[in-house]
């Protein structure tokens, strides 16, 4: 995934575009030597290039979970992190968030992790994906718009990583690719523009770069009392939907957590 804190702000409102024909956001600088223009070698951020999933760069960890167990019966959570040094992705598949992936100053600076949880609501499976846009330190707030853009651009790659890394699950239960994907963007109260929930449609479509949101759909609500049609129960959900990581664990705070406390 592209670096989420080191690129300039994009000031215009936009919807992510995946056309490889777009011009670079940051043109190369030019310098003059002996009266001639000479182009310097300056890295250009690949913000508008195609988002491509490379299976060879994905490392998958199964942590205390049955690879073949249906997520409607056993909690199943994905924790995906990215290394800007190696350009590799690490995907942990477990019953709860793998907090060890979120530790360290670098991860706290970047906050480019994506966590997701399978949920069954009123008998229907859906994948709830969580992205941290702003809150925690000032750089995240300054680059909130750019971070939202990058997350939207890279999410199809993330979803492909989930499907590829959890291949045995999808081979055994191919119907899961028909499940709706709900994306929760978490942003501090002062930047509410990016504190929202979007439906990206069925997983098999959401993992494609041309997928769009389905604004006509409403987020399904779990039953308030114990039932058999919803899973996991509210008190066992590993993702209480937070805007910030406190002590390396997700904690519910104001914002989306207040609006949708049953996530």
UniProtKB/Swiss-Prot annotation:
Q: Does the keyword Transit peptide apply?
A: yes
In chain numbering, the transit peptide falls at: 1-54
Gene Ontology cellular component?
chloroplast
Biological process GO annotation list? chlorophyll catabolic process
Q: What induces it?
A: Up-regulated during dark-induced senescence.
Instruction: Recite the UniProt keywords alphabetically.
Output: Chloroplast, Plastid, Transit peptide
Q: Does the keyword Repeat apply?
A: no
* Pfam families referenced in this protein's UniProt entry, alphabetically: Staygreen (PF12638)
Coiled-coil regions in this chain? none
Question: What compartments host this protein?
Answer: Plastid, Chloroplast
Query: According to its UniProt entry, what is the function of this protein?
Result: Non-functional protein probably interfering with the disassembling mechanism of the intact light-harvesting complex of photosystem II (LHCII) in the thylakoid membranes. Responsible for a stay-green phenotype.
Spell out the family assignment given in the record's similarity comment. Answer: Belongs to the staygreen family.
Q: What else is known?
A: Corresponds to one of the seven genes studied by Gregor Mendel in 1866. The wild type line JI4 has a functional SGR protein (AC A7VLV1) lacking a two amino acids insertion. This protein is involved in the chlorophyll breakdown pathway.
Report the protein name in the record.
Answer: Non-functional protein STAY-GREEN, chloroplastic
């Amino acid at each position: 995934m592209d670096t989420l804190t080191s690129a300039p702000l994009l000031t215009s409102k936009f919807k992510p575009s995946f056309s490889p024909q777009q011009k670079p956001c940051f043109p190369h600088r030019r310098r003059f030597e002996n009266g001639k223009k000479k182009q310097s070698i300056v890295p250009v951020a690949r913000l508008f290039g195609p988002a491509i999933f490379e299976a060879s760069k994905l490392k998958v960890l199964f942590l205390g979970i049955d690879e073949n167990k249906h997520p409607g019966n056993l909690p199943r959570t994905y924790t995906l992190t990215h290394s800007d040094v190696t350009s590799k992705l690490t995907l942990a598949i477990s019953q709860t968030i793998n907090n060890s992936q979120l530790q360290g100053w670098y991860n706290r600076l970047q906050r480019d992790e994506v966590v997701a949880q399978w949920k069954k609501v009123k008998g229907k499976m859906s994948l709830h994906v969580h992205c941290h846009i702003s809150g925690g330190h000032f750089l995240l707030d300054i680059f909130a718009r750019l971070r939202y853009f990058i997350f939207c651009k890279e999410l199809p790659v993330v979803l492909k990583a989930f499907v590829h890394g959890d291949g045995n699950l999808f081979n055994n239960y191919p119907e899961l690719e028909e499940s709706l994907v709900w994306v929760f963007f978490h942003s501090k109260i002062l930047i509410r523009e990016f504190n929202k929930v979007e439906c990206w449609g069925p997983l098999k479509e959401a993992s494609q770069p041309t997928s769009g949101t389905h604004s006509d759909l409403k987020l399904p609500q779990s039953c308030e009392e114990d039932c058999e049609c919803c899973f996991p129960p509210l008190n066992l959900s590993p993702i209480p939907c937070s805007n910030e990581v406190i002590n390396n664990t997700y904690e519910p705070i104001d914002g989306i957590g207040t609006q949708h406390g049953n996530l």
